[in-house]
Amino acid sequence: MTELKNDRYLRALLKQDVDKTPVWMMRQAGRYLPEYKKVRAQAGDFMSLCRNADLACEVTLQPLRRFDLDAAILFSDILTIPDAMGLGLYFAEGEGPKLKRPITCKKDVDNLIMPDPEGELQYVMNAVRTIRRELKGSVPLIGFAGSPWTLATYMVEGGSSKAFTKIKKMAFCEPQLLHTLLDKLADSVIDYLNAQIAAGAQSVMVFDTWGGVLSPRDYKDFSLQYMTKIVAGLQRSYEGQKIPVTLFTKNGGQWLEAIADTGCDAIGLDWTIDMASAKARVGDRVVLQGNMDPSMLYATPERIRQEVATILASFGKGNGHVFNLGHGIHLDVPPENGKVFVDAVHELSMPYHV
């Protein structure tokens, strides 16, 4: 394999010395970039873009041409697994993801296909292989999947939700059925991420977007225990290289200590938690990723730089920080503000690594 020219991100995840704090942005490839919109139009629809390895590679690389990012992240969607399980993923204009055949009963769970990463999901692995080749060792490639709980919310609700009544009804009225579903999803995520690692992903991330809608007890029962299972099942080294894993629960600040106990290498933080208090709570057990409010990218360059400086000071000196937004970049953010953000992280973090 090609030697990495910039391994700052991987070094930070392994708590090794870096010259400056590494930075990437969740959803860095996407609709805020005019060049992305052109490729998306060329593909016809979102899933056609995901299924075309060359186009998925192109949009993955686009932000790296604009910004001095320390990592690339696979362009895909967390709902590829439910789609491959037979639920029929589609995107309604202006409404987000929908599933044609949501889960309503035990029979639906029993009938789920356990997807083969090199079968139904081979298009994702082809994209990973293509991106890894085209990166030519410039920066590492991050693979990812949704958490079992988050995937289950879409599979039971049939799409996005505000109140999560259907999945919570299942959790509280038929908990064993939900546990059966979550267990199947955990097994599928393990297979999927290990296949991404074999195809070339150098780090992986699990997105638990909706874990934060659960009570503390229910979070541990229905989300955290399945992410713990995933961490235990992942291939943590490949071809002599360690493969770090990051867990991210949006609105998960109250559970940092428990997330650190999963055995993950890093925890993603959203902007609702103070970086200094997060660091004080988990110590040096895990690396912290985050955590600027993505809406800060609407602000002036001066204000963006000020916020970056504040978060860097909050983390303080030393290693173990990957800078990121606290969630995905908004679709109407001016791209030039992304550059201000990335450049500010590199420039202002150098004194913390002397």
From Swiss-Prot:
Native species: Psychromonas ingrahamii (strain DSM 17664 / CCUG 51855 / 37)
Gene3D superfamilies: 3.20.20.210
GO cellular-component term (any): cytosol
InterPro entries for the chain: UROD/MetE-like_sf, Uroporphyrinogen_deCO2ase_HemE, Uroporphyrinogen_deCOase
Main location: cytoplasm
Compartment list: Cytoplasm
A UniProt-annotated Pfam family: URO-D
PANTHER family for the chain: METHYLTETRAHYDROFOLATE:HOMOCYSTEINE METHYLTRANSFERASE RELATED (PTHR21091), UROPORPHYRINOGEN DECARBOXYLASE (PTHR21091:SF169)
Protein name as catalogued: Uroporphyrinogen decarboxylase
GO MF assignments: uroporphyrinogen decarboxylase activity
Gene name as annotated: hemE
Quaternary data: Homodimer.
Positions bound to substrate: 27-31, 77, 154, 209, 327
Membership in a protein family: Belongs to the uroporphyrinogen decarboxylase family.
